UniProtKB/Swiss-Prot annotation:
Protein origin, superkingdom: Eukaryota
Record's protein name: Lysophospholipase nte1
Lipid metabolism among keywords: yes
Localization terms from the record: Endoplasmic reticulum membrane
Coiled coil: none
One biological process term in Gene Ontology: regulation of phospholipid biosynthetic process
GO terms for MF: lysophospholipase activity
Family: Belongs to the NTE family.
Key words, A-Z: Endoplasmic reticulum, Hydrolase, Lipid degradation, Lipid metabolism, Membrane, Repeat, Transmembrane, Transmembrane helix
Alphabetized Pfam families for the sequence: cNMP_binding, NTE_Ploop, Patatin
Amino acid sequence: MESLSNLGNAMSSVLSETTSTTATAILADPTEALSSVVALASDAVSKATSDVVPEHTPTSWFTIILWLLHRISSVLYFVIKLTTITTPTFLFNIFSTSLTVTMNATTLVLIMLFMMAGVTWVVRYRYLNMYSRLPPEPQRKEPAVDLFPETQEEGVKSGLASYFDEFLSAIKIFGYLERPVFHELTRSMQTRKLIAGETLNLEEEQGFCLVVDGMVEIFVKSARDGRRSSSGPSFESDDEEGFAPGRQRYQLLTEVRNGAPMSSLFSIMSLFTEDIQMHDTDDDDSPDPTPSAPGTAMPGYPMNANFQQSNDTLPSIPGTPLSDNHVMQRGMASAESLTMSPLAHDSSRIPSLSLVNTRPAVPRRPVPKRLNTTSAHPDIIARATVDTTIAIIPASAFRRLIKIYPKATAHIVHVILSRFQRVTLATAYNYLGLSGEVLQMERNILKHTVRQLPNHLRGDALDRLKEKFKRERERIGEKEVEKGIALHNAHAARRRRSAASLRKEVALQAYSKRRQSIVTATPAFGTRRERPSPDMPSPGDLLTNTQQLKSGPASQLDLARDATSPRPQRNLSPFSTPRNAHVSLDTREALDEDDMFRESVLECMFRAIGLTGNGSVNPDSTQASPRFVPTDQRRSRGGPGHTAFGFMDAFDPFDNDTESVTSCGFSSSSPVPNPQLLAHDMKDEVEIVFFPKGSVLVEQGERNPGLYYVIDGFLDICVPGDDSSHDLLQSSAKVDHGHDSATGADAFGANSSRFPEPNMNNNFGAEQKKGKQGRRSVALIKPGGLAGYVGTISSYRSFIDVVARTDVCVGFLPLASIDRIVDRYPIVMLTMAKRLTELLPRLLLHIDFALEWVQVNSGQVLFREGDESEAIYLVLNGRLRLVEDQKDGGMNVKAEFGQGESIGELEVLTESARTGTLHAIRETELVKFPRTLFNSLAQEHPNITIKISKIIAARMRAFIDDPSRMGLKDNVVRSYKSSSTLNLRTVAILPVTAGVPVVEFGNRLMNALSQVGPPNGATCLNQAAILNHLGKLAFNRMGKLKLSQYLADLEEKYGLVVYVADTNVNTPWTQTCITQADCLLFVGLADSSPEIGEYERFMLGMKSTARKILVLVHQERYSNPGLTRQWLKNRMWINGGHFHVQMAYTSNTVPIHPPTKRFGPSLKQRVQILQAEIQKYTSRKVRHVPFYSPDAPFKGDFHRLARRLCGKSVGLVLGGGGARGIAHVGIIRAMEEAGIPIDMVGGTSIGAFIGGLYARHADVVPIFGLAKKFAGRMASMWRFAFDLTYPSASYTTGHEFNRGIFKTFGKTQIEDFWLEYYCNTTNISKSRVEFHTSGYAWRYIRASMSLAGLLPPLCDEGSMLLDGGYIDNLTVSRMKSLGSDVIFAVDVGSLDDNTPQAFGDSLSGVWAFFNRWNPFSSVPNPPTLAEIQARLAYVSSVGELERAKTMPGCIYMRPPIDDYGTLDFGKFDEIYGVGYKYGQEFLQKLREQGVLPLVEETEAKKALRRTMAPRRASI
């Protein structure tokens, strides 16, 4: 109560004060009074409260609330006042005010002009000038040359490691050797030390010699005994008379260094075939001959029944002493000494491999030929230049090897024989022009392969067969007859089934049983198919494979009985006669006459190739017992090897098992079968075919499709009449071979038995040319003869043509069957090797000693710049690159060399230093042709040097006349691009990263290569194919030798080998793909990340120097602008360009990297998935179609890539000419309608514009609309007038011109163009021509169209660029340097006025003016100042144009557009129609002349190839 009283007193005092104050204030101002009253009241209340209420009481919160209410009321009051009083008052005052502005017209116009200028500036320089603000994208610089230093310099190793390295390097010539074979060959090896100057008579050395350390000079006895040569080496001192009786002179052949063999390929074949006896033909008039008694004929001479033909076999070798008596006597003496040698005694246990029957001998006169000596090194001596260590493998080691491991021996002989043909014969034939000697050997070997049919098939039976063919010929007509008529074979289906589908099963089963037999040492077969006798060939061979399938155990028992006693079975033949007692047929009544022909023909074939069946079938040796396993075999099968030479599987090109070549050693592998039984078993493999006169059965340079046995008629062995030594080394890219498989299919497929169809003289291309030039006959094959023997057995290309001289009936055995026989029976290969060694002329023998087979690894340097020129190199397979050092420290690629090309002739002949450094891009096989051999041949056979002189002269002429090499020295793109894509033999397809469908890509590329690829086909390899062929051990240490040889054989067989890296990164197969490739294709998905992939990092780690190409795979035929630049930005090693390919593929839904567990990315991914699912049902379905789909297969992207890899690209070069260039559009349309694919496009001026449109869209429809739109802009005079400026540098600013081009191309870069494209400009800052292949397309196309005076130059990296037509208006030479095979060049430039002028030594301008307007003046008008300047500017272009017209492979086109001016863009439709009409007429003429490279015609030509087309006619 006391507090309340105090409060009341306080309130009363406050009210009294307030009342007095209010009264005073009201009198002054009522408004202020109200506010003051409120303030005083508040203060009074607060004062009273503070006096009454103590601190920290609840009344303090009441004060705060009152203060807040006061503030809120103040704000509400202000807002209400603003919206109800202040704002309406302000608006009322504004709208009620009236303003009057007064100005004159000038001010108004100026204001409007300023406003328009501002808008114009914004539009002109901010919107329309967008092209000038693009981010800078300079041209991509050409990548530097990859030349990595050698990992191992020559001569660094020493001691024991060096010894083994040199030894292994020398025996590489044998191919791969398994551990037991290697041990057997080297366990009796001897070494010998030679001091400097010591001479070794190799003629007395019976073995294989090689240099381990040091250097040896190889000399040959000179054939010019009576003549002295000042330059040839001579041993005339008294100390050396013992080695040179009668002062014999010697010629230096070669120098042998570390790791090289002293023995030649001929020597090795001689060592392997010492015990093989030669046999003669079997005529009707006499039984089979045998070697005559001593004194009658020299041992080893081939016998000839036709004495009158002996003169034809004499080889025409200048200076070769074939008839010297003392030489003959010395050869006979050496032969006798050999028979008494202890080595001969050791061979007594060797199973007989004789090819001669044991009937009484009939003495015959020997055929004159090369002296047959028993030495493996005839007329050869060696002299050590320094202290030298040599190793000798004696001949006894080779004889033991034949006895123990005959299958391995056959493979080694096959390798040596193949290299002998590739190295010696091919070099002599192609490079030295020794076609006569090689053809003489072909002719002589025919006499050893004649086997006559039995008499009962020569008379009425042969007439009935010819009558069948005659009736069929009349029925089907002459056109079909040209392809051949085959006798119907009712058992063909059974043959194909037994040979293809069931062969693998039987081989695997037989192999497993054989392994069981070896391990358990028990009889191998106890099942229904058990082998009754160990005399039979081993299971899985040719006989067992087919007979087990056809006849079961009964027929096998019969076969075994026949094999053990073949002669009684012959006597039971009802067709046998005393005259032909060696031929017999089966007595089954169901055997008809056609089967008789097949069986007899096949038996004659087998006897001709060496399967006589007279060898010891059951030799008395432990090797014939199946219960005995040799020591080497027990070691090899006892577990992993304990030496560096691990046990390896066999090289079997047709089996998929992994049987070792040594596994057959215990049973002599191949007891020579009875040819009658083998023929009976394989009679369904042979075809009886009729060919009319003039048919070409085998063409020079192609692989033989099989063996031809002449039944009736005559075959002619010919060579082209103009030059008998065509280039067989390079013929693989020109001539169709006998293997049409483009996918590496099994050789025993359904088409393996089809006989090849002949090429007639009226066929396409080369056949027409040959028919016109004619052929030169070398020999005649009569009935009973064999054609294609050497080429078929050795699987090498033919040196000759085989042509039907008359209507001929032949028996044809396909190559697949021959290969199986050769693989199973080594005697076939040994027989041919023996025949070749016996018939080899002395000149070829000495060349064989001098030539060296060299194998180099990837990156290895053969010689360096400045080295002495010691040898010429010939490339067998692989790839080499020649580079030269530049002054700035870089390297410039001069050339690349592929298969069949030669390097270094000019330096060797001029004895000058090397002009560059030569290194191997990949593993390469070479022939080293030493300078010493050239000097020796030049002295004894000067005519040989003519061939090499012609090669050098032709090469220098091509170098001088090649316009592509002129003016390109300072160009950013090197001239080596011309050789970079030519003669490619291997291509590897690698993904950029995992997940790229390289297998599908490879399949599509192979499909394209089969249509437009090399004539001899292409094959595709992946890891599965390699493992299927070589087994699971294909990639180990020793397996690499086997693999490299197999890959080399494929390169020799096919024109292109495609490797597909379908494995992980760090696998041996991926490494093999990179090391074996001439060109690497990195395939990436364009929509994926452009980061460097793991495969690329792996390749960079391997330091590959091969050509590298980037292939971007798109879902649609369109590339987003700038996408390609992102891919190329970090890949400076891409030095072969890039390709855009359209291929539908399914993207990999499984992420390559494991997803992270962060919340953000996971949520984002989930939202994207939900959005995609929702849009699937809610959005309108958009039909995704490519921007352009090719209407013909040959225009597809894979065909374009295939043509580029094969060097068959078609280029289109468009010239400049202003509005006349509209005709380009019409010509392109005509080319598309004619079916001509365009792979590369180049242009100048208006040609650069039209070419850029076509390169971007690859279709004529879009370029027609865009070109017409641009022509409309250029025809507008208003745009031209608005672009005028003060003519300091040009009459226009160039803006409108830039806008027109930019609106056409946008931000697209040249790298984004679908086709490969370039344009040229004239760099007036550096006075040179420049070619542009990267950067913004609109800039360089605009620069190429910048006519001086009309448009200003375009600035690019400080240089000023003008129209490229000032230097070269038709860039054919540039297109040729890029590797185009066929070039279509369209010229639309103006023609110069060549009217003769005679206005005198001085000229009055006034007279010239009136003369121009005087219609009666007869004096021609002098040129104006502008015309003189224009002609001066195009002076160099005229010369380039004339060279382009004569460029090989260039098709020059010039439509009739001379009536149209440079600026007549308004006549678009008219000029377009002129070009289209001209293109149609011109291409129609080319089609009629047969010049037009139509794809349809190419396919038709391939359809006529006898190795590809199916059989058309069959009786």
